[in-house]
């Protein structure tokens, strides 16, 4: 087997983070009386940009990051930030669904003998809901709450490798995001796989080892290595 361990970004790689937040934010826009809101994707991209700025500051629990990100987006758009919005966005995230390929592909990867590990920018009580949605056992889960830091901090991947007790070149990190995942995993010496679900052109400044449109590519890789 080529990679004894596969580590995964969760939201955006295994779970439809983009669609989930896009739908939530578009519904918030309409409920706020925004007569000409941009598409959900545009709102989600702005939400992500605000969030990325916040997670690079002093560590705060992810639920607080979500609430502050939404509050700032509401301020920008002229929407009211209402009582209950902070809890509503956390509740929405807990219900985000896996991509159609996620469960069956992960079952194949696990059946091939590869250990499955999640490394996620979230809180423990949020990821626990998502794990129930995934329905596939994971050997370990590391969240930002465990480390006191968020990806793309190099500390996240240093602690991950320490936790795994494996040489970095024997660990494959699977993710859709370059700035959060592929770049810092490469710096840590891990092998990397880009899940390019939207068939986007690759950035020219970050190297990676594999590229697939979905997780079926990973399943084939580990099965062929047996």
Task: Name each region found by the language model.
Residues 1-103, 111-112:
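N-terminal helical cap/lid subdomain that shapes the substrate entry/recognition surface
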